[in-house]
Amino acid sequence: MTAFSEILQRRDWENPQSVNIHCLKAHSPLASFRDMAHARDGIHAQRQSLNGQWKFKLFDAPEQVDGQFTQADFNDAEWDEIPVPSNWQLQGYDKPIYANIKYPFDVNPPFVPSDNPTGCYRTRVSLSPEDLLNTQRIIFDGVNSAFHLWCNGTWVGYSQDSRLPAEFDLTSHLVAGENTLAVMVMRWCDGSYLEDQDMWWLSGIFRDVTLLSKPQHCIEDVFITPELDACYRDGSLSIVTTIAAPETYQVQVQLFEGTQAVTEPNIARPHNRRIDERGTWNDDVVFQTLHLREPKKWTAETPNLYRLVVSLLDENGTHLESEAYPVGFRKVEISEGQLKLNGKPLLIRGVNRHEHHPELGHVMTEEDMIRDICLMKQYNFNAVRTAHYPNHPRWYELCDQYGLYVCDEANIETHGMQPMSRLSSDPQWAHAYMSRYTQMVLRDKNHPSIIIWSLGNESGHGSNHNAMYAWSKNFDPSRPVQYEGGGSNTTATDIIAPMYARVNTLVADEAVPKWPIKKWISLPNETRPLILCEYAHAMGNSLGSFDEYWAAFREFPRLQGGFIWDWVDQGLSQWDENGQHFWAYGGDFGDEINDRQFCINGLIFPDRTVHPTLQEAKYCQRMITVSLQEQTQKACTLLVTNENLFRTTDNEQLNWSLLENGQVIQTGSQVLSVEADSQTRLEIALNFTPKAQAQYYLNTDICLIEATSWAPAGHVVATEQMALRNHAGLAMPTLRTQPAPKLTENGHAIVVSSLDEKHQWRWDSQSGLLMEWNVDGKAQMLAAPQDNFFRAPLDNDIGISEVDNVDPNAWVCRWEMAGIGQWERHCVQCESETLAHAVVVTTTFAYHFGGDVQAITQWTHTLSNDGEMLLDVDVTLADALPPMPRIGLELQLPLHQADTPITWQGLGPFENYPDRLAAARFGLHTQTLAQMHTPYIFPTDSGLRCGTQWLQVNELAISGDFQFSVSQYAQQQLAEAKHTHDLLAQERIYLRLDHQHMGVGGDDSWSPSVHKEFQLTEKHYRYQLRFSPASR
């Protein structure tokens, strides 16, 4: 018996050779069905969940633990209870720590801090004498970061690797009746040096704990390899079954579709019997093959699954137990420089996904997983990378079932190590590396959804990677291996897998330069496909120029897509002292080593509501595209392209609508039937009389006819909008004949009134500002319209993701140096004159900062008797200024009601920015004031709508060619707030009207990533806006 003091002295948690002790060999998940029909139907598995309330106590370090807690008679009455699975930091113990690169402790591998929070767990399990006739194994699916296990006071073993199962044989330690399990979990171990992923550091038993009962003679593992013939028509299964049984025992395999057998039973006996060093029989291996003519193929589009039942029979043919696995017939290969599935080159519409729950941390329920998968499919994702570790076992089963391609990634990242490859090249760590990779492959090898293995993430490149790669190609040559480290194109990867390489621009400020992806595939002797393991960093208001990636993917066959970073904002639910909810990020728990909001870079919020960026991703990744080929006044010819590689559009309907000046005037629908990977032409009959100078658009929505497993009937899978030519002539111009309004100058006041006194404007000639604007005595604004050059910085503007200090090249730093947002305004001149039909008030402003004039603007107001004001703004900027955030104006309007409707004719309905508007459609949109604001967890500028021609807010209508946003928050408040609960909604509406607005960027979030064509580099701008009463 191993004493507790010996375990403390041995310090397995600081020894990279002690990966696991007494753990059973990794294998595919086992269920031990005692009936073949049960195995076929997946019912009555011999698995007992040990999830529930366990006794718990947290100690400061392993040395502080009372070793008697392992004993059955230990009095734990004063201990707390904690749910298993859970992370103890989210149950009121210890604190979460978020870091992207930095280790949250001093780097001195393999040693960890002496201050090493240690959670001790206890639970009791009752077993009958009949239970003890079988072997009993306990499986911990995930424990962070390392643990020792005791059963009835006897030490059982040790394990680390937070993201893979640890399985122990408890049979010899159990008794009939009540049994006590005790677990000691350390927050830090040497394995923590290999788990430096961009996520929260959380601890505890956070995945399921299961007791598996198996007969003495049993199936230990099954390895299934599906194959397709050269024509990708007929299929076969290679099945390797490992058993612990006498040589006279047999293995039967049979394939089912539902309850129907599709092959005859195949029975075989073991081969290659060996006697091990203990003089006993070693595991026996049985090789079998099944053939099936023209099986239904598995793809993400058509996730057809069969079920293989593998049964152990004794020498008399008596059934002992069965295991069963879903089977998908598919073939993954790289040929002609492309990653192919069933002979077709894939286009990876992928996303990186962390296992994150806003209340439960790293605990994921099946409902959470299904919700994520359905959202992914609804937004046109077909692939997921398990960034950066093996996921919960159930995740892969659901990906098999619903249809997602999976890049399965080993739990290895040493991002904070200097150099990054330090441990990757160290033979002392080779066993730890190999264990993490091989055990992942051994667990997950039978899932058809897994089409790529990944050696890990951001660990440089070293001999340990080469060893993993070599083992993988030998053990499972049916799947390619990818790895980004060391330049994305080392000999340890079958796929060029860069992160954040750009479409056309060289990223040269890296240790290893990242070529433009278009150039990368044309480098000499480079024949591999390129799939970005990470791209389009979706941090906050981001994803600018995403459509450029997809244009390149569709143009160049060896550019085969990528995985967006990333799926979900890793915010944790918290409440402030006033009971107001907010999403917490790094530093909010007193974690001094942190990377702030860099964990907030998802396409969806923590509660799974969607960001506007997800709309752009959905559009660019759509599987069905529609383009306008021909147009007459009576008809349009559309080209419909089905980018699905394996399925006809047999459940899709094309709904179309004709818009006149943003309003629908005609609709129609047509069922689609387009063969996989092909095109067809459709003719749409139009029945309308065009109006002079009206704008016409044809919208198409491709919708599901019937519900699927991942979306309801009517779900829109793809949209398109096409501008149509107007065949009508021009409209006759309207001449203004009304008299000019009345102009009065009184001291510093310039007052303009309509002749009926209904409309009145008043300027202060000293400030040059329009101080009052009344209609029927009712104020139209609360503060004067003013030039606006500032935006509350976006995460991409700040550019401080991986360093403590602001990069001087970051937009926010350049804007601060130029004083943008701090300029002093001086009125140079304010004058007025009466014309034949209008009064003109002209004001010139100079903006000063640092002793220099930074900008000069001239506002020319042309006022008509009917209450219309035409505003002409001329802007001249100093040559030394950096590209500007925006060119526009802001005015403050009264707030009449909280749900004030905002109606506009322009791009929408969701938020869009100049470099992120491919998904937006021109139309007449109405949303409430609240809907116009996007509550980014780290507050920034939000809510812009581009391509606007007309806008109504309250009783005010604005027309022109502009972009706008409305908000109850001042820009400065947004700039200063760190969380949404810091924002206090004002009793007014901030209306921002922009002539030009800089793009948001998003190739990455730590360098200035706004493309040049979306930067405001000109030094002269001029724009016009027309204001009028909405009731006019």
UniProtKB/Swiss-Prot annotation:
Residues noted as binding substrate in the record, renumbered to the chain: 100, 198, 458, 534-537, 601, 1006
Keyword line: Glycosidase, Hydrolase, Magnesium, Metal-binding, Sodium
Residue(s) at site: Transition state stabilizer: 354, 388
Residues annotated to bind Mg(2+) 2: 594
Tagged with keyword Disulfide bond: no
Active-site residue numbers: 458 (proton donor), 534 (nucleophile)
Record GO terms (molecular function): beta-galactosidase activity; carbohydrate binding; magnesium ion binding
Keyword set includes Glycoprotein: no
CC annotations in GO: beta-galactosidase complex
EC number: 3.2.1.23
Transmembrane segments: none
Catalytic activity: Hydrolysis of terminal non-reducing beta-D-galactose residues in beta-D-galactosides
Positions with a binding annotation for Na(+): 198, 598, 601
Binding note for cofactor: Binds 2 magnesium ions per monomer.
PANTHER family: BETA-GALACTOSIDASE
Name of the featured protein: Beta-galactosidase
